[in-house]
Amino acid sequence: MSRHPEVKWAQRIDKVYITVQLADAKDAKVNLEPEGVFSFSATAGTDGNLYESKLELNDKVNVEESKISVGVRSIFCIVEKAEAKWWKKLVRDDQKAPHFVKVDWDKWVDEDDDGADVNVDGMDFSNFGGMGGMGGMGGMGDMMGGMGGMGGMGGMAEMMGGMGGMGGMGGMDEFEDESDDEEEVSKPQDAEKAAEAGKSQESDAKTETS
């Protein structure tokens, strides 16, 4: 059986801020319809519990201009109203707000004040309209998974491993060893030549004496 995540909301004359409080949400899907239907589903917790909620918002919305940001602790949505006016509550006037929907006092301003927009610096947003709802975010998982194909870079590791054949440059040592061997082999020949030269000098000396 699914559970309901806590949903907080605040508004400005032209937009609504909706925050779904759910830490470490997995497979999150958020859908927004022009008529104002907002639906959410995701799994969370060590047991992978399913969390769902569906709200019929107070009025129509502009899906194309609305944005969503998925964080570690929550999913934050900026829903643009189709008509710039203040809503009496988040859901339709003929409905009672669910128990899990609460006012986000940190972002709330009174209608008379209509303060500045909420500071969203540091948040990464995606457009609802361009993504067909956050369900499209799953596509990002696939895309990132595809980048796992970067594991194909392991092929580079193999290629580089093949360059380990450069270790064959160690063959240079073999060349050096061979040249050393040649030097060592030539030394006895030099000794023999020296001995022959010595004998020749001795015979010359005997000839001169005689």
UniProtKB/Swiss-Prot annotation:
Chain intervals for the UniProt region annotation (Disordered): 165-210
PANTHER family associated with the record: CO-CHAPERONE PROTEIN P23, TELOMERASE-BINDING PROTEIN P23 HSP90 CO-CHAPERONE
GO biological process per UniProt: chaperone-mediated protein complex assembly; protein folding; response to stress
Biased composition (Basic and acidic residues): 185-210
Cellular component, GO annotation: cytosol; nucleus
CS domain boundaries: 2-91
Induction: Up-regulated in the leaf sheaths of rice plants grown from seeds that were inoculated with the nonpathogenic P.fluorescens strain KH-1.
GO molecular function terms attached to this record: Hsp90 protein binding; protein-folding chaperone binding
Source species: Oryza sativa subsp. indica
Biased composition (Acidic residues): 173-184
Family the UniProt entry places it in: Belongs to the p23/wos2 family.
Protein name according to UniProt: Uncharacterized protein OsI_027940
